C-alpha cells in the first residue's frame, strides 16, 4: 500500500493529462482511418481538433497546480509550461483547419497527415515541460522527426522531397551537436540528468566555471538556435519553407518555434545559471544577427513563403530581446508576443493557402489586384501582415511595444534601437504586398488574378479554411485592443514559476557590483 502510493506520488500522472488526451486522439485518428478508410476523412480532422481543444481545457484546469512535478522529476507542469503547451496545441488545431482542403487537393492521406502532426504536437508539448536531459532529447527528436516527415509529405512534389532532405540532413547534424552538449552537461555534473541537480553539481565545482561548461553551452545554444531559426543557424529555413506544404510551414513557424523558446528558457535558466552572463551575451549577438539579416534579406524576396521565412527569422530576433532582458517583463513579453504571433502568422499562412489553392502560385507579383476579385482575402492578409509589421492598433504592435519596453527597462538600449529600426524595415516589405493587392487599375492585375476562379465554398475542406481565416483575423484585430488580459496571463505564468523567479533574483544580484562601480 505504502509502496504503491509512493510510486503514484512520484509519477503524478495527472501532470501529463493534456498530453494523454492528445495521445488518445492520435490513437483514435489511426484506428478510425484503419476501420473506416477514406470515408473517415469527413470527421477525423474535427475529432483531432476537439481532442486538442480538450487538451487546452485540461491545461487550463492545471493552472496553479500545487504539485506540478511528475514522472520522477522528469516533467514540470508549471504555469510557464502550461502557456507554451497551450500555444502549441492551439497552433496545431488552427493548422488542421487550414490543411484539410490543401491535403485533399493533393490526393494524399489526410488521416496520416493529421497523425504525424499530432505526434509533432506531442513532442513539442513534452519539450515545453521537460525537466530532465533524457526527456528533453526524446521530446526534441519526436518533434524533429515528425517535422521531417511532414516536410516531405507531398511525395509527388520534388520541391517537398528536396526540402525534406535538406531539413533532415541539417536537423540531424543539429541534433548531434545538441546531444554532444547535453552529454558534456551529464559528465560535468557527475552523472546527473535532472536540470536542477545538474545546476547544483556544476555550481559546486570550480564555482560553476570551466572550459567544459563553456563548450557545452556553445553546443546546446547551437541546437536551440537551429530550432528557433536564429542566425547563423537559419540556412535551412528559406528553402524548407518554400518547398514544404504550406500548412506544415505554418506549424513550423509557430509550434516548433514556441517549443524551441520554451526549451531555451528552461534549459539555460536552470542548467546554465552559473554562466548567465555568457549565454545572455551569446543571445544578444544572435538577436542582432537575426533582426538585421532576417528583415533585410526579406526585402529582396519574390516568393511569399520565402519572405515569411526570413520574416520569422527576424521575429525570432525580436523575441530574443525578452530572453536577453532576463526580467519579469522580459519573459512576460516573450510569452505575450508568441501568443499574438500565433494568430497573425497562422492567419497569413491561411490566406496564402487559399490563394495558392485558387491560383497554384505563391509569387508576390501574382497578388497584384487581388482586392478586385477577393476583398475578404485581401483584408485578412493585409491585417495579418500589418500586424506582423507592428502597425497599431493591431496585436503585433502591442507585442513589440512590450518587448522593446522590457529591453529598455533592462538597459538594452542598443538592442531596442536596432529592434525599432529593423521593425521599420519589416513594415516596408509587408506594406509592399498590401499595396500590390489593392491596385485600382484593371491593367495592373496579375495574370493569376485576372484568371482568378470563383471560390466554391461547398468543396470539402473549404469551410474549415474560411473559419480558420476568420478566426485568426478576429484574433489578430482584437488581441491588440484587448491585450491586457493576454498580458496578464503571460505575466502570471512568469511570476508564478519558481525557476524564473530564482533566475531573475540571481540576475539582479550579479548586476549589483557593476552598478556600485
UniProtKB/Swiss-Prot annotation:
It catalyses: a plastoquinone + NADH + (n+1) H(+)(in) = a plastoquinol + NAD(+) + n H(+)(out); a plastoquinone + NADPH + (n+1) H(+)(in) = a plastoquinol + NADP(+) + n H(+)(out). GO terms for biological process: ATP synthesis coupled electron transport; photosynthesis, light reaction. Pfam families: Ndh2_N (PF19530), Proton_antipo_M (PF00361). It is a multi-pass membrane protein. The chain crosses the membrane at residues 16-36, 43-63, 80-100, 110-130, 133-153, 168-188, 211-231, 245-265, 279-299, 307-327, 335-355, 379-399, 401-421, 467-487. It is found in: Cellular thylakoid membrane. GO terms for cellular component: plasma membrane-derived thylakoid membrane. InterPro entries: NADH-Q_OxRdtase_suN/2, ND/Mrp_TM, Ndh2_N. GO terms for molecular function: NADH dehydrogenase (ubiquinone) activity; quinone binding. Keywords: Membrane, NAD, NADP, Plastoquinone, Quinone, Thylakoid, Translocase, Transmembrane, Transmembrane helix, Transport. Its EC number is 7.1.1.-. Its main location: membrane. Coiled coil: none annotated. NDH-1 shuttles electrons from an unknown electron donor, via FMN and iron-sulfur (Fe-S) centers, to quinones in the respiratory and/or the photosynthetic chain. The immediate electron acceptor for the enzyme in this species is believed to be plastoquinone. Couples the redox reaction to proton translocation, and thus conserves the redox energy in a proton gradient. Cyanobacterial NDH-1 also plays a role in inorganic carbon-concentration. HAMAP family: NDH1_NuoN_1. Belongs to the complex I subunit 2 family. NDH-1 can be composed of about 15 different subunits; different subcomplexes with different compositions have been identified which probably have different functions. This is NAD(P)H-quinone oxidoreductase subunit 2. It comes from Rippkaea orientalis (strain PCC 8801 / RF-1) (Cyanothece sp. (strain PCC 8801)). The gene is ndhB.
Amino acid at each position: 500500500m505504502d509502496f504503491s502510493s509512493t510510486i503514484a506520488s512520484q509519477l503524478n500522472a495527472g501532470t501529463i493529462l493534456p498530453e494523454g488526451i492528445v495521445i488518445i486522439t492520435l490513437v483514435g485518428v489511426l484506428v478510425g482511418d484503419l476501420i473506416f478508410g477514406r470515408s473517415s476523412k469527413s470527421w477525423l480532422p474535427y475529432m483531432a481538433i476537439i481532442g486538442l481543444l480538450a487538451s487546452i481545457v485540461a491545461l487550463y484546469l492545471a493552472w496553479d497546480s500545487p504539485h506540478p512535478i511528475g514522472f520522477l522529476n522528469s516533467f514540470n507542469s508549471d504555469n510557464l509550461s502550461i502557456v507554451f503547451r497551450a500555444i502549441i496545441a492551439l497552433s496545431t488545431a488552427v493548422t488542421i483547419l487550414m490543411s484539410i482542403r490543401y491535403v485533399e487537393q493533393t490526393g494524399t492521406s489526410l488521416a496520416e497527415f493529421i497523425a504525424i502532426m499530432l505526434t509533432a504536437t506531442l513532442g513539442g508539448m513534452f519539450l515545453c515541460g521537460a525537466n530532465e536531459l533524457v526527456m528533453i532529447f526524446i521530446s526534441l527528436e519526436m518533434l524533429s522527426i515528425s517535422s521531417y516527415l511532414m516536410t516531405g509529405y507531398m511525395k509527388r512534389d520534388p520541391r517537398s522531397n528536396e526540402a525534406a532532405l535538406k531539413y533532415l540532413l541539417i536537423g540531424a547534424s543539429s541534433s548531434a551537436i545538441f546531444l554532444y552538449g547535453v552529454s558534456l552537461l551529464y559528465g560535468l555534473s557527475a552523472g546527473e540528468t535532472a536540470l536542477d541537480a545538474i545546476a547544483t553539481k556544476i555550481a559546486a565545482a570550480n564555482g560553476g566555471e570551466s572550459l567544459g561548461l563553456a563548450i557545452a553551452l556553445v553546443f546546446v545554444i547551437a541546437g536551440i538556435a537551429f530550432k528557433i531559426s536564429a542566425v547563423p543557424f537559419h540556412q535551412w529555413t528559406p528553402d524548407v519553407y518554400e518547398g514544404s506544404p504550406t500548412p506544415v510551414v505554418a506549424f513550423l513557424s509557430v509550434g516548433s518555434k514556441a517549443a524551441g523558446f520554451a526549451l531555451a528558457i528552461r534549459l539555460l535558466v536552470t542548467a546554465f545559471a552559473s554562466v548567465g552572463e555568457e549565454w545572455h551575451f551569446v543571445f544578444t549577438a544572435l538577436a542582432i544577427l537575426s533582426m538585421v539579416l532576417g528583415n533585410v534579406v526579406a526585402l529582396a524576396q519574390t516568393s511569399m513563403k520565402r519572405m515569411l521565412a526570413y520574416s520569422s527569422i527576424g521575429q525570432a530576433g525580436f523575441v530574443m530581446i525578452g530572453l536577453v532582458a532576463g526580467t519579469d517583463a522580459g519573459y512576460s513579453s516573450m510569452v505575450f508576443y508568441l501568443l499574438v504571433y500565433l494568430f497573425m502568422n497562422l492567419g497569413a499562412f491561411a490566406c496564402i493557402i487559399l490563394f495558392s489553392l485558387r491560383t497554384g502560385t505563391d509569387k508576390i507579383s501574382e497578388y497584384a489586384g487581388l482586392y478586385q476579385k477577393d476583398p475578404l482575402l485581401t483584408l485578412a492578409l493585409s491585417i495579418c501582415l500589418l500586424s506582423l509589421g507592428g502597425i497599431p492598433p493591431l496585436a503585433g504592435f502591442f507585442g513589440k511595444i512590450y518587448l522593446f519596453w522590457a529591453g529598455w527597462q533592462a538597459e538594452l538600449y542598443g538592442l531596442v534601437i536596432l529592434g525599432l529600426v529593423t521593425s521599420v524595415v519589416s513594415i516596408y516589405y509587408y506594406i509592399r504586398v498590401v499595396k500590390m493587392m489593392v491596385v485600382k487599375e484593371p491593367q495592373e492585375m496579375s495574370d493569376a488574378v485576372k484568371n482568378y476562379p470563383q471560390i466554391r465554398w461547398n468543396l470539402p475542406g473549404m469551410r474549415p479554411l474560411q473559419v480558420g481565416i476568420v478566426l485568426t483575423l478576429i484574433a489578430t484585430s482584437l488581441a491588440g485592443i484587448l491585450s491586457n488580459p493576454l498580458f496578464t496571463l503571460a505575466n502570471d505564468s512568469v511570476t508564478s514559476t519558481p525557476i524564473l523567479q530564482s533566475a531573475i533574483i540571481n540576475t539582479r544580484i550579479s548586476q549589483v557590483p557593476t552598478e556600485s562601480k
